[in-house]
Every structure is written in structure tokens, then in C-alpha cells.
Amino acid sequence: MGGTLAIQAQGDLTLAQKKIVRKTWHQLMRNKTSFVTDVFIRIFAYDPSAQNKFPQMAGMSASQLRSSRQMQAHAIRVSSIMSEYVEELDSDILPELLATLARTHDLNKVGADHYNLFAKVLMEALQAELGSDFNEKTRDAWAKAFSVVQAVLLVKHGN
């Protein structure tokens, strides 16, 4: 049943929305390390306890995080993973790709509240980075794409 829900949710994302997500993602990947680092700095600002899930980065200030090799390495991993998801938005493979992430997040006690915060922060970071390219269609496309990803993750978590 989980796979069916995921595939059905993917069907709700239009071809035009997928194109917008892919186009803007490619724009963002020109500065992937700084973009993803900014996302995590925003997460840690909203929820300082989330930073403790990364022992190697616990207690670092925003400026320390920006120059941290650990944060840069994590940003590269996250941007690579997200690039896979963006490319596979219309693929039956997406739920399986997300299952691996769900297992890792389960081990680190990352759940629905964290995904909701990530969605909020991602939208803020998208708007800040894309500027005037972040219009209503872009916002709607990203909101829908993230809702697809989040729905699959929550099914894989068993929530």
C-alpha cells in the first residue's frame, strides 16, 4: 500500500511543476555547498536541538558552520542525494531511494516534525537564493514536490 500512495502522490505533480523544480534545482546547484549549508543553519536557528543530531557540528556558530569541513561534506552529501530525488520525481524508483533515507533518519530519531521544519526552511532558502525567480509557480511546484517526498518518507517511517 505504501508504494501505491507514493506513486499516486507523484502523479499529482504536473510535468510543468517537475520542470520548474528541476530547472531551479540546477540553478541552486551552482552554489550547492553554500545553499545546503544555509538550509541547515536555518534549521539549527529554529531548532537548536537539531544541531545535536550532528555531534561533529554540535555547538558551532553559524559562521563556524559555514567554514566547517564537516558541514561542507554534509552539504555535498545532501545536495547529491537531493539531486537524485529531483531527477527521479517521476520515477517508480523514488520510493526506494527515499526508503534508505527513512532508515537513516529512523536511527537518528528524525521524524515528521523535522520534515515539517525542513520544508519551511527549504522554502525560505529557495526564496532567498532564487530571488525574483521564486514566484508563485515556483513556490507551488516546490511545495508539491516536497509534499510528495515527505509523504513517501512518512509511509516508509510507518507514521
UniProtKB/Swiss-Prot annotation:
Heme b binds at H74, H105. Keywords: Acetylation, Heme, Iron, Metal-binding, Oxygen transport, Transport. GO terms for cellular component: extracellular region; hemoglobin complex. The keyword Cell wall biogenesis/degradation does not apply. Coiled coil: none annotated. The keyword Phosphoprotein does not apply. Pfam families: Globin (PF00042). The modification N-acetylglycine is found at G2. Residues 12-158 form the Globin domain. GO terms for molecular function: heme binding; metal ion binding; oxygen binding; oxygen carrier activity. Belongs to the globin family. Monomer. Caudina arenicola coelomocytes contain four hemoglobin chains labeled A, B, C, D. This is Globin C, coelomic.
